[in-house]
From Swiss-Prot:
Post-translational modification: Monoubiquitination of Lys-120 gives a specific tag for epigenetic transcriptional activation and is also prerequisite for histone H3 'Lys-4' and 'Lys-79' methylation.
Entry protein name: Histone H2B
InterPro entries on file: Histone-fold (IPR009072), Histone_H2A/H2B/H3 (IPR007125), Histone_H2B (IPR000558), HISTONE_H2B_site (IPR055333)
UniProt KW keywords: Chromosome, DNA-binding, Glycoprotein, Isopeptide bond, Nucleosome core, Nucleus, Ubl conjugation
Glycoprotein listed as a keyword: yes
Pfam families membership: Histone
UniProt keyword ATP-binding, yes or no: no
Region named Disordered: 1-32
Amino acid sequence: MAPKVRAAKKGEKRVGKAKSGTAETAKRRRGKRKESYAIYIYKVLKQVHPDTGISSKAMGIMNSFVNDIFERIAVESSRLSLYNKKATISSREIQTAIRLLLPGELAKHAVSEGTKAVTKYTSSK
């Protein structure tokens, strides 16, 4: 026969399993994280002008600018891969998209910096 279990009276300590979820409810839930290029923009700023700061409003504008350029390059390179009936966007499509999107000297510098970055990445593997 099973032993009898009596209910705890008011004021008595309860012995047994702790309530599940108490540790989870004690922790505060974080909101969804916002992805941003802010830390990278700041690192580049410090490389170029170590003594210069940036306001949060200016950082927001720079972040929007980077997102916009990134999207334009992605759309243009996607369009180029469709024209060439290719399923994959390669560095060639990215390079051509940059040449089409950016004017003159800026495009040349962007292509050379991009090539340098890709070479550095592939050699480090």
